[in-house]
Curated annotation (Swiss-Prot):
It comes from Acidovorax sp. (strain JS42). It is an enzyme of class 3 (hydrolase). SUPFAM superfamilies: Acylphosphatase/BLUF domain-like. Pfam families: Acylphosphatase. It comes from the Bacteria. Belongs to the acylphosphatase family. This is Acylphosphatase. Residues 9-95 form the Acylphosphatase-like domain. Its EC number is 3.6.1.7. Keywords: Hydrolase.
């Protein structure tokens, strides 16, 4: 399924102090407020990974949020890459991989 001009999907990898600080829960709440679909999960290497799909301004707002995260987080960098369209309904926390 091709992305429309109004809808984008991005893969994020967040580095820094981002586990054990409610990052996933906070990102899930932010994504739901913005109407972004997808998921977020911890990785065993200490990063957080997410897939965000939706209207371009909403996805960009979530990416902007990812650079800050919740108050206890210390984000060092956020890698963002284009991704294939996502057919997720809603935004969920997934298990660590």
């Amino acid at each position: 399924m091709a992305e429309s001009a109004a809808s984008i999907t991005r893969h994020l990898r967040i580095h820094g102090l981002v586990q054990g600080v409610y990052y996933r829960k906070s990102m899930t709440e932010a994504a739901r407020r913005l109407g972004v679909q997808g998921w977020v999960r911890n990785r065993q290497d200490g990063t957080v990974e997410a897939l965000a799909s939706g209207a371009a301004p909403a996805v960009q707002a979530l990416i902007d949020w990812a650079h800050e995260g919740p108050p206890a987080a210390r984000v060092e960098r956020v890698e963002v890459a284009e991704a294939p369209a996502c057919d997720a309904q809603g935004f969920e926390q997934r298990e660590t991989v």
